[in-house]
Amino acid sequence: MSDFLPLGHKRAICYSGFRDGQSPDARVFPSKDEIASDFRLLQGDWDALRLYACDTHCERVLEVIAEQGFDFKVMLGAYLAAELSNPNCPWGGQHPEDVLEQNRQENLREVERAIALA
């Protein structure tokens, strides 16, 4: 674990390699070649990447770093959906209970993926 902490002061950027026609919602993710191409542009200017979710994109990012030796630290994100309704939320905070329960289950899987990838 000491290899990962502390992150200290780093030049960091939020990274999402999605191109036109790609979307995490549609489950269409950047290829390893596209990610590596991005990393060649980012290396030297950035030390750390912040990712948004523990999905296929995240897995590919970590694989490209390991396989091709890019020198990036990764701040892993977890994409969590609403588990409670919030009627005061301006962008739609009311959800049926079955949706909230589905979100709770998916959130649990997302956290488990984050722990496994960390």
Segments (PLM) and residue ranges:
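Hydrophobic faces of well-ordered beta-strands that scaffold small-molecule active sites
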Residues: H9-Y15, D47-L51, F72-A78
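Soluble non-cytosolic domains of exported or imported proteins
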Residues: F29, D33, Y52-D55, E101, ...
